[in-house]
Amino acid sequence: MLTQRPTLSDIRDARVRTESIVIKTPILTSEYFNDLLGMELFFKCENFQKTGSFKIRGASNAVFSLTDEEAKQGVACQSSGNHGGAIACAAYLKGIHADIVMAKSVSKAKIH
């Protein structure tokens, strides 16, 4: 758990840990919406990530930050969808166990 703000070094370390997992997604704009709203909008397309959301960024950084001893214990999270999928994906890629707890009311589309 973070007790202080991440440093530039922390951010660089996270990039190294996740560069083989996280996809460099495009930033797009829309002439239609720009004209409609009278301003230039930019859309970061994180939906192109392996798990369909930006959540893989933090999940893979957290999972790949674990020590060997911590990784042996596996990981767990509670989620309504995207975070759970990202933790499960990162754990799979690291070769460790993951328990994902989801409410019964979660949309079936969110369960991979």
Where are these regions (language model features)?
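PLP-dependent amino-acid enzyme catalytic core
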Residues: 1-112
